[in-house]
């Protein structure tokens, strides 16, 4: 299984700590190798993503932050890539519609409970693994025309 790269961005350290703890519990429970990087500001996250979009598979993003809000951060990320999975985590339910405007996978309301984060993380991990397997298969196999048929050949 692919190592999963996750970013957690929230301006409140207490929420970052809780989410990271839950992700670590999930990682141990399902024996999945997960690397987590944390950010306290949307601009900081966006700067890192602009340098290397492939850096993250999943981003947990607070909506209400002082420098640049989570929705604008997500819009900036979407200008660079449609592939990264974005999950909003916030105290403000009123932003839910905007969250889906940037094709977020989920919208989790604070205070975050493990069962809800586990549900969302499970969906996200399946999507990441599927995309990884699909890309790996595209790189491993080629279609070769044979007479009136096509054969799939393993090139490794």
Regions found by a protein language model. Name each.
Residues 2-23, 59:
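Conserved acidic segment of CheY-like receiver
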Residues 47-51, 55-132:
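CheY-like receiver
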Residues 8, 38, 88-89:
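Conserved SAM-binding loop
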Residues 120-156:
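Conserved binding/recognition cores within well-folded domains
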Residues 36-44:
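Conserved Asp/Asn-Gly motif in the active-site loop of CheY-like receiver
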Residues 27-36, 54, 84:
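A generic structural motif
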Residues 1-4, 136-138:
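Extreme N-terminus of proteins, especially the signal/transit-peptide cleavage junction
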Residues 17-26, 45-46, 74, 124-125:
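Short, well-ordered amphipathic alpha-helices
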